[in-house]
């Protein structure tokens, strides 16, 4: 079975979000599972520099200009690169300029990505062609459409990492992207009078996956589907929509081997976690005290992530004696709010605006509770890292958060399945009730340690996801 992942970023070469983490880990897990998985990426500068053994496979003149297809390797995974400097050789973000304006030629930049993905199934590399083209998010959404236009030389899977990003472009660009105008249709890639790369992937793929079972159900409901619920409900009825939970890359996220921690530990040596907490308290300007629970946030600061709820609930958390360490950036209003809280509550609130991968490991190793109060969360990786590190996740019941964290209710504690704290409603009162439950459990150290061990024993490895995808690919053949 030969599978080509078509996507726009890959950790650690280039990362703007969780998609990169998936592509950085899933193909390698699939190779270990017996699938010949390769990755197709635009040759953005950081990616091009990282694939040091790239060789020319093919040269083509396309609707988007001249391109060179390269092939090399990264961490044992075969990587195809679309080398088109006039489209991809730009500093900074792959999607927008330094003023945060989307590049005006994004329609060509990402149509080309989908086109090359489909051409790979038609022999662009004469020595290797995929049985399945697996496209990820809107950037690769046209790959299934190009395959459909070519008579489907390979099966296609389209994975939705976040339905909120749709890749919308003016209709007249149909003239530029080498797809038939008949595809510009409600039964096709048209959405609200525009081209939707996301809808193209959803409509033309042989199968759609979402990054968790709960999110796969949620996106058939109007409040989560952004107007595409009709198509997604139809795909669900046809058995062509399913959820496959993301995994954790244990080579990077494991407290037993994590060199970024002050003190490494396992579920059997949890007492060694304490030094990480002490170092984190020092680094964040918090009072060094192992008797108080340290809550943490590692997140984009947006209302989608529920960080306004944390700000609203913060006085209640602090009144009970807790501390907060926050690492993130985003909405300027939220940034100012958390910085003001740090100034108002010195020693109890520590805030670092920005994102530093290394420091996120130190927070995960040092905190007692990781807050993930998202309004919606397709899968979420932060709570999985928390489980892995014995840093109990406090989450809202939505998307992948609902699939991965079990509340510390009396029943779940008795059944040995409790792994964190879960609240239902997206408001500060509901969040505060969950925080209160965390304090109650904290007051019972042996029970807290029991739940930590339960959490750390859970298996969210990429091998589980790789097996699920392999079974799906073979069903499509």
UniProtKB/Swiss-Prot annotation:
ADP-alpha-D-glucose binds at residue 15. Its EC number is 2.4.1.21. GO terms for biological process: glycogen biosynthetic process. InterPro entries: Glyco_trans_1, GS/SS, Starch_synth_cat_dom. Pathway: Glycan biosynthesis; glycogen biosynthesis. GO terms for cellular component: cytosol. Keywords: Glycogen biosynthesis, Glycosyltransferase, Transferase. Synthesizes alpha-1,4-glucan chains using ADP-glucose. Belongs to the glycosyltransferase 1 family. Bacterial/plant glycogen synthase subfamily. PANTHER family: ALPHA AMYLASE DOMAIN-CONTAINING PROTEIN (PTHR45825:SF11), GRANULE-BOUND STARCH SYNTHASE 1, CHLOROPLASTIC/AMYLOPLASTIC (PTHR45825). This is Glycogen synthase. The gene is glgA.
């Amino acid at each position: 079975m030969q599978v080509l992942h078509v996507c726009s970023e890959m950790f650690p070469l280039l990362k703007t979000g969780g998609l990169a983490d998936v592509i950085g880990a899933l193909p390698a897990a699939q190779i270990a599972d017996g699938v010949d998985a390769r990755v197709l990426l635009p040759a953005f500068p950081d990616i091009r520099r990282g694939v040091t053994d790239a060789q020319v496979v093919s040269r083509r003149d396309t609707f988007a200009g001249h391109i060179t297809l390269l092939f090399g390797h990264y961490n044992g995974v075969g990587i195809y690169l679309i080398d088109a400097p006039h489209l991809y050789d730009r500093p900074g973000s792959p999607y927008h300029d330094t003023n945060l304006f989307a590049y005006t030629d994004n329609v060509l930049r990402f149509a080309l990505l989908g086109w090359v993905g489909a051409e790979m199934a038609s022999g662009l590399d004469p020595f290797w062609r995929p049985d399945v083209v697996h496209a990820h998010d809107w950037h690769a959404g046209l790959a299934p459409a190009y395959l459909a236009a070519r008579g489907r030389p390979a099966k296609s899977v389209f994975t939705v990492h976040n339905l909120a990003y749709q890749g919308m472009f003016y209709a007249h660009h149909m003239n530029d992207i080498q797809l038939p105008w008949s595809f510009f249709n409600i039964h096709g890639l048209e959405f609200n009078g525009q081209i939707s790369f996301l809808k193209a992937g959803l409509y033309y793929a042989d199968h759609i996956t979402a990054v968790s079972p709960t999110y796969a159900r949620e996106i058939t409901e109007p409040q989560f589907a952004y107007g595409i619920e009709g198509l997604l409900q139809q795909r669900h009825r046809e058995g062509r929509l399913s959820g496959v939970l993301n995994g954790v890359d244990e080579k990077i996220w494991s407290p037993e081997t994590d060199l970024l921690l002050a003190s490494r530990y396992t579920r059997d040596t949890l007492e060694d976690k304490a030094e990480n907490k002490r170092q984190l308290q020092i680094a964040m300007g918090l009072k060094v005290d192992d008797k108080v629970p340290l809550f943490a946030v590692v997140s984009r600061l947006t209302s989608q992530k529920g960080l306004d709820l944390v700000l609203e609930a913060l006085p209640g958390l602090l009144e009970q004696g807790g501390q907060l360490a926050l690492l993130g950036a985003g909405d300027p209003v939220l940034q100012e709010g958390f910085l003001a809280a740090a100034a108002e509550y010195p020693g109890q609130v520590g805030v670092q605006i920005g994102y530093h991968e290394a420091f996120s490991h130190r927070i995960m190793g040092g905190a007692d509770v990781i807050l993930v109060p998202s309004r919606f969360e397709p899968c979420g990786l932060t709570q999985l890292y928390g489980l892995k590190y014995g840093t109990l996740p406090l989450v809202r019941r939505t998307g992948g958060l609902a699939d991965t964290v079990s509340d510390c209710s009396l029943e779940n504690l008795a059944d040995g399945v409790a792994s964190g704290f879960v609240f239902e409603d997206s408001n500060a009162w509901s969040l505060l009730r969950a925080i209160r439950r965390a304090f109650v459990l904290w007051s019972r150290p042996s029970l807290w340690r029991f739940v930590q061990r339960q959490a750390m024993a859970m298996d969210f490895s990429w091998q589980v996801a790789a097996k699920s995808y392999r079974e799906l690919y073979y069903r499509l053949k």
